[in-house]
Amino acid sequence: MKISLIISTYNRPEALRLSLMSAKVQTRIPDEVIIADDGSKENTRELIKNFAKDFPCPILHAWQEDKGFRLAESRNNALRMAHGDYIVFIDGDIIMERHFIADHERLAEKGYFVIGSR
């Protein structure tokens, strides 16, 4: 199963850095990470570019112009870029437990949509 991890963000590069660090050490690395960016400034773009240099899977940056809070639209933009059979959405301030992606893969069932909260 090919897994796409979509991480939403907006001008919180330090939180995104921690989230990406947790993605990098997963026991099951996602096949791609897509950053759903709702118009962050250049420092977020630089952070993503630096992480992409030695990340264990491709990192894509789905940026949209900042026109106010448009989280759903930014997630949809990222979803259009995804190649995974299974999509995991998280917010950019989530630090994943190291088995987070592996647990999703193990528990995935065709035809189901699962949502959770903190």
How should these model regions be labeled?
Residues 64, 90:
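Catalytic metal- and UDP-sugar-binding loop of GT-A-like glycosyltransferases, i.e.
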Residues 17-24, 76, 80, 102:
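Amphipathic, non-transmembrane alpha-helical secondary structure
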Residues 99-118:
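Conserved donor NDP-sugar-binding/catalytic core segment of glycosyltransferases
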Residues 93-95:
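Acidic metal-phosphate-binding loop of nucleotide-sugar-dependent transferases
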Residues 20-63:
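Acidic donor-binding segment of Leloir-type glycosyltransferases
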Residues 65-82, 99:
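Glycine-rich, basic loop-to-helix element that forms the pyrophosphate-binding segment
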Residues 87:
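Short aromatic/hydrophobic "clamp" motif used to bind/position activated sugar donors
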Residues 1-25:
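N-proximal low-complexity "stem/linker" segments adjacent to membrane-targeting elements
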